[in-house]
């Protein structure tokens, strides 16, 4: 019945149970649907209180800028990656996305290239290094690193060698 019923009004993403006319089983298997649960309200309140305690919005912006700089400096210095957004004026300082490039990467088939970010993500997740940083499903194959004010620059700096390690492992 879910597959045959189309409401006349738009549904919030949280309540959409089908995609492309078929039931979306991924949402029942733990896939992220990018809609916050109402159960997360207390987490938002705690985060807002924490943000206020460190200096409010100006401090959070400063932290996000510092975090993005750590990752962006690495991207700009690393020949096998590039920022997914070419125009620096259009880049975000929170969800920094980058794609792979270079001689080895370019020698791969299109399908193999598309698999590289996901393989790196899975390798690092298996090591307990990071979670939920694979690129968006509908974006070009990429990695997406959270650089918002809620993380420490040192943690982003610690992640970078792991990405380098995983990329090197894939080339073996």
Regions found by a protein language model. Name each.
Residues 1-74, 87:
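Active-site C-terminal subdomain of aminotransferase-like
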Residues 49, 157-164, 168:
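Amphipathic, non-transmembrane alpha-helical secondary structure
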Residues 54-56, 78-84, 171-172:
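Surface-exposed helix-capping loop/turn segments at secondary-structure junctions
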Residues 76, 80-154, 158:
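Conserved C-terminal alpha-helix-loop-beta "cap" of PLP-dependent enzymes
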Residues 124-131, 163-171:
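A common structural junction motif
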